[in-house]
């Protein structure tokens, strides 16, 4: 039985580009050939998969939110996408990381804005536990924030 295995691949930029284009096309074809972008939310995208999709040029869009924020706090379109980030805060919202150094030290991500719930139905105690006196909704999730405004959930 003979097996032909690759022993050496000369990785010239032209070859690398063509291989990536071929892989990207195969992925897009698997989605019917008409996919514009892959939208991810509800749970983090596996880091290895995210890096792979990014490396072959598959357009990825990431969003982060909660039921209480109906539904988004952050969102990034593929043209402003940064690997590992769930994007900057969406319009009509404010968000920040409660940390002495939000860029380097994770802290709780809090948000306020038009789409934050008014409170839990008939449960003031639960509402007070998550929305402070300044109207910030406490997500309970840890994050960092880059100078660009992109958030990174930890």
Which ranges hold each PLM region?
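Gly/Ser/Thr-rich phosphate-binding loop
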Residues: 1-81, 94
